[in-house]
Regions:
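RNase H-like, metal-dependent nuclease domains and their acidic two-metal-ion catalytic environment used
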Residues: 1, 5, 19-24, 36-277, ...
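Conserved AAA+ ATPase "SRH/arginine-finger" region at the nucleotide-binding site
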Residues: 30-35
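Structural signal for short hydrophobic segments within the conserved structured cores
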Residues: 26-28
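Short mixed-charge
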Residues: 5-19, 282
């Protein structure tokens, strides 16, 4: 992570007025096809594409396959070995994303689909799919309207903005505020309670928004918002979350073992935006759960449900689809976090925790407890008679 940060801080296209990058260095990435042994012609030039006629190499050998096709054939041969495919990408990278992939062993998710989506996101077609920015209260007046302001240094990544009639859809009931677009989607959040840590490396806050099928003008089963940041204070993070909820008009499922965010929402009058845990009926909730909502994400059964939710989403909606299209999650940070997710050590996986809660929130009907209806035969003590013949007889 430190080397990747150094590399990103050395982007030559992002220099200050003195002509310096943030690190004072210039980054350089050379894709593997530019210098792959066995695919250089006699003039020292790479043979990128398969030639119509064989090309002579520097030692007189014939080159009849382009390096790109050779690379794709090797990758295709590893499609049933996700760990091997990941290692192949790391050793022979064609993109910066390939070069910075971590070593991944025994991933519990479908790495092939995750990598298909990452490679697709790196393509030209998705370059404008994500906008960075921040949410602001209109004219600085809290609890009014929320607006989105594009900003290259913003904390939010978004791929969909609802139409004006869907923005800031707040319903007021019994003096409380409730989301007006809960039929369109929901949010998941991995919060934190402490503003700072002694080493400055505390986990980040994460927020993800996901849509479901609806009749509204909105994408279907699409992650439309990604927020992975740790502002200077926890209150800034809480306000960021609140503004996103209000702007999209959707409810939130958050961890309640770190409850400051949920108390913040309640104090501001937005308790109606905090979902109760979907796996229990209201009369089974604890006192704190009734007060602020949320779900404890520490028990083993919740961990398994959470991981299964992500796994199901990846299998259905990530990577290459049966119709030849690709999934519409354009956030590579989240995809990379899924690829590295360790269910036994989830502390560093803020994006995976948050996105999994969003999936659970959108599929909350799957976790609702089922009530078994039992029928009981009641004996009212009525006498029964046999009316055959001229005289009826009591049935004993």
């Amino acid at each position: 992570d430190n080397f990747k940060k150094l590399y990103n801080d050395s982007d030559v296209t992002k220099r200050n007025r003195n002509g310096q990058t943030s690190s004072g260095l210039y980054s350089l990435f050379i894709p593997m096809e530019w210098n792959y042994e066995g695919f250089i012609d006699s003039f020292g030039l790479p043979v990128f594409d398969t030639p119509g006629t064989p090309v002579e190499g520097p030692h007189g050998d014939k080159i009849d396959v382009g390096v790109v096709e050779h690379w794709e054939n090797e990758a295709d041969g590893l499609k049933d070995d996700p760990d091997g495919l990941n290692e192949f990408y790391r050793q022979f990278p064609r993109t910066e994303e390939h070069a910075f992939r971590d070593e991944t062993k025994n991933s519990i998710f479908n790495l092939q689909k995750i990598y298909e989506q990452i490679d697709y996101n790196d393509g030209v077609l998705t370059s404008g799919a994500v906008t960075k920015g921040n949410f602001k209260w209109e004219n600085g007046i809290k609890d009014s309207r929320v607006i989105f302001m594009p900003d290259l240094n913003g904390r939010f990544n978004i791929s969909w903005i609802p139409s004006l009639n869907l923005q800031n859809h707040v319903i007021t009931k019994n003096g409380g505020k409730y989301p007006g677009n809960e039929h369109i989607g929901a949010f998941g959040c991995d919060s934190y309670d402490i503003s700072g840590t002694t080493d400055g490396r505390g986990s980040k806050g994460a927020l993800h928004g996901l849509t479901v099928f609806s009749m509204e003008d909105a994408p279907i089963n699409s992650f439309f918002l990604e927020y992975i940041a740790r502002p200077q204070t926890a209150e800034i993070f809480f306000e960021d979350v609140l503004m996103a909820l209000v702007f999209y008009g959707m409810p939130l499922l958050a961890e309640n073992n770190k409850p400051r965010l949920l108390y913040y929402l309640k104090r501001r009058g937005y308790r109606g935006y905090s979902m109760n845990r979907p796996d229990r009926t209201r009369n089974k909730l604890s006192t704190a759960e009734k007060e602020i909502g949320g779900i404890p994400n520490t028990s083993e059964d919740i961990k398994q449900i959470h991981a299964a939710a992500i796994e199901s989403y990846i299998d259905k909606f990530v990577g290459l689809q049966e119709d030849g299209s690709y999934g519409n999650i354009y956030f590579n940070a989240t995809l990379n976090d899924w690829s590295k997710f360790n269910i036994n050590n989830r502390t560093k996986h803020d994006a995976a925790i948050s996105s999994g809660l969003a999936i659970m929130a959108c599929n909350r009907h799957l976790y609702q407890p089922k009530h078994l209806r039992q029928t009981k035969v009641l004996d009212f003590g009525f006498k029964k008679y046999n009316n055959e013949g001229s005289i009826s007889k009591i049935i004993k």
